[in-house]
Curated annotation (Swiss-Prot):
Induction: By lipopolysaccharide, interferon beta and IFNG. One of its GO terms (biological process) is dendritic cell antigen processing and presentation. Residues 225-249 are cytoplasmic. Receptor for the invariable Fc fragment of immunoglobulin gamma (IgG). Binds with intermediate affinity to both IgG2a and IgG2b. Can bind to IgG2a and IgG2b monomers. Does not display binding to IgG1 or IgG3. Recognizes neutralizing virus-specific IgGs displayed on the cell surface of infected cells and triggers antibody-dependent cellular cytotoxicity (ADCC). Confers protection to lethal influenza virus infection. The record marks D217 as: Important for receptor turnover. This is Low affinity immunoglobulin gamma Fc region receptor III-A.
Amino acid sequence: MWQLLLPTALVLTAFSGIQAGLQKAVVNLDPKWVRVLEEDSVTLRCQGTFSPEDNSIKWFHNESLIPHQDANYVIQSARVKDSGMYRCQTALSTISDPVQLEVHMGWLLLQTTKWLFQEGDPIHLRCHSWQNRPVRKVTYLQNGKGKKYFHENSELLIPKATHNDSGSYFCRGLIGHNNKSSASFRISLGDPGSPSMFPPWHQITFCLLIGLLFAIDTVLYFSVRRGLQSPVADYEEPKIQWSKEPQDK
């Protein structure tokens, strides 16, 4: 059994080493906002290492492969169904961490560049209108209280976030003569040393390989055990008959 397990373990170890040595691909959004309105245009860019023989890219939406192999994946007119997690992978890069994109319906949307901020991070907020219609007299509100007012629409920048900046945000302004408000969005701050939302991909790969090795070990164990027990079960003790020699008569 150990003679069978050793080559398998070597193969899995080699594969794990190759995976650990590869750089992870990265997905970037252009524009940078993770929340958009319907009919907005969004470009997802994949950065990774390519091989001379293969410069194609694999794109995934909610873990399903997208039939697209270019470095840029363009969503010309976003729809709610385009919401979800996006990943990419190149020939010489491991699969990227997921980037979450949300597509909303409405007149106004409070946009942000990240889902989770750390203390000290800059926070960029934007009061975005459907079809980029002009918005005037924009107010950003935190926990129901006015935080910043702009006569002409502008982004709200918090240079270094503190825990006092966490809370529920929304914006409101005039589109034409109509007063419109966005839905609320909660901004949460984590500690700088807090772990990432998603475990590193090489850790996931290692766990999968260990699980696969355990499954192979179990199958081989029972196969060898069955093979050793079968001859014993089929064995029957021979019957011995004694006969007297002629001189014993």
